[in-house]
Amino acid sequence: MGSIGSQRLKEPCVAATSDQSVVTSFSFDNFQLETTAEGAQDPGIRVRGVPTFTDSAVEEPVPDDRYHAIYFAMLLAGVGFLLPYNSFITDVDYLHHKYPGTSIVFDMSLTYILVALAAVLLNNVVVERLNLHTRITTGYLLALGPLLFISICDVWLQLFSHDQAYAINLAAVGTVAFGCTVQQSSFYGYTGLLPKRYTQGVMTGESTAGVMISLSRILTKLLLPDERASTIIFFLVSAGLELLCFLLHLLVRRSRFVLYYTTRPRDSRPVQAGYRVHHDVASGDIHFEHQTPALSSSRSPKESPAHEVTHSNSGVYMRFDVPRPRVKRSWPTFRALLLHRYVVARVIWADMLSIAVTYFITLCLFPGLESEIRHCVLGEWLPILVMAVFNLSDFVGKILAALPVEWRGTHLLACSCLRVVFIPLFILCVYPSGMPALRHPAWPCVFSLLMGISNGYFGSVPMILAAGKVSPKQRELAGNTMTVSYMSGLTLGSAVAYCTYSLTRDAHGSCFQTATAAAANDSIPVGP
């Protein structure tokens, strides 16, 4: 019986024999049984009641991403959690016209980063407690609401006074920051469960959001001379794109491909096919029942006891199977939360520092300092063009991050630190105020191009590599931990950028002062 049934039986009480003795109890060390037909030369030779069979596919085959639909959905996911913020800061011409002489772009950037840092820390705490898709859905709703509210109530209907509108815009940016950051942090944990290319897809989507928003603003400004009308259309287009990303997420999360990767790491062990032994006490017949993984996992503990006696028309059956461990879900303690994060951080510390330094340097300059670059001929078009160049080159950099290059964490960190050279170069484009050292508009465009490519590449590669350095069960936590580092760099960079506002305070009136001085010189009478 033992050689035919399981790989190894333990503690048998009475063995079933050819003289119709009854097996009363036994237990298994393993679910899977060897095929009984392997040792039989004649198909008719078998123990009474035991059928010959072969095991079917034990593990579910890996599903394909047909037509790269899942990759495209993840790219749009990246669009979704940066598109709202980009919408607020890219209409820089409207902001300068409505709030002249204020630091509105700097205030929006700092508000976004401070709220985003708090949101990513909160999300990192509740990552084991709240459902992944609950967090993502909440993020989408918090991002869509302010976009629609500002476009309708402030830009279109103009229901608020100047000071009220200023405060409401900052509050809207803060709400967007909270929702989008929870969404972003959750998506990095989400894609950490998928193959590496999907993390790269999400990060490419972030840059795609910047490109799409920049093109949208340029087109609406060109096609609609009325600044207010173009801004309304601009915000409504952004809200429509955000809604599209949300609906696509709801479809993709139920796909077979995503479910295959996101459900496996949560199990304590892989769910494999098993067998149940049925022994007919009356007739002595014994047969094996094959259980598929889906069937095994769908049964409740009451439906799958270790030892059950059932009655049927053919007699009494005694069923023997292996009890599955009952896992009691409990919230981890604060000490356990810290320990989990410490274990992950020890493995990916270089990647954490690399992404933090990369975004620290970028946020020192973008969008704050870049939005204040002025030119007497191009006017408000120059900051729009400079930001568009950055978004486009950042998009290219994140595509380059998909190249199969093996990086050591320390090398990535060193290259990220070299980007500090962009800070003095951009300062020379705005300082001295009114007559900067690098006045030609080509300079900020070239610097923005190089900074965007390097930001896209060195901001993506650490995030892509980090998830592969930890076990599958730790990948969601690794993605969230990397997002904490990412947001820390953004916060410090925004704080430094806010301090540079004084360098550009007089830039708005520089062209007017130059024109006035030129007119005064022309009016001075010239002697004979």
UniProtKB/Swiss-Prot annotation:
N-glycosylated. Belongs to the SLC29A/ENT transporter (TC 2.A.57) family. This is Equilibrative nucleoside transporter 4. Other than a moderate activity for adenosine, PMAT does not interact with nucleosides, nucleobases, or nucleotides. Mediates the uptake of clinically used drugs including neurotoxin 1-methyl-4-phenylpyridinium (MPP(+)). The chain crosses the membrane at residues 69-89, 102-122, 140-160, 167-187, 232-252, 347-367, 377-397, 412-432, 446-466, 482-504. It is a multi-pass membrane protein. Activated at acidic pH. Glycans are attached at N521. Expressed in heart. Expressed in choroid plexus. Pfam families: Nucleoside_tran. Glu-206 is essential for cation selectivity and may function as the charge sensor for cationic substrates.
